Amino acid sequence: MADAAESIGILQFSLDSLVQQQQAIANNIANVNTPGYQATKVTFESSLAKALADGGAATAQIVPEGLASASDGNNVSLSTEMTLMQVNSLQSQTVDNALSDQFSILSDAITG
């Protein structure tokens, strides 16, 4: 079982990655009408799994999305980005709740 510091570290990495993902989504939406713009996404799930398996640090990566391009070369789908934004928001709330729970447990352990 992971200790509190490890759990908090994993949750912190997750929250940081979700913030990066939100920034990428916002950037994609801002460029929905920019000719030639290629949407990006942040991948961290595989990095987190590898770091947990190896016991090392995890890093999020920003990679281009492989969607089909429109005639102007832009591959941003507004409906996809809006859906991703909602999913990201729910994931952020879940991680935030888990982090609050961890701090509550630590507080209870300290104060008795």
Question: Model-predicted segments: where are they?
Answer:
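Amphipathic alpha-helical polymerization modules
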Residues: 1-112
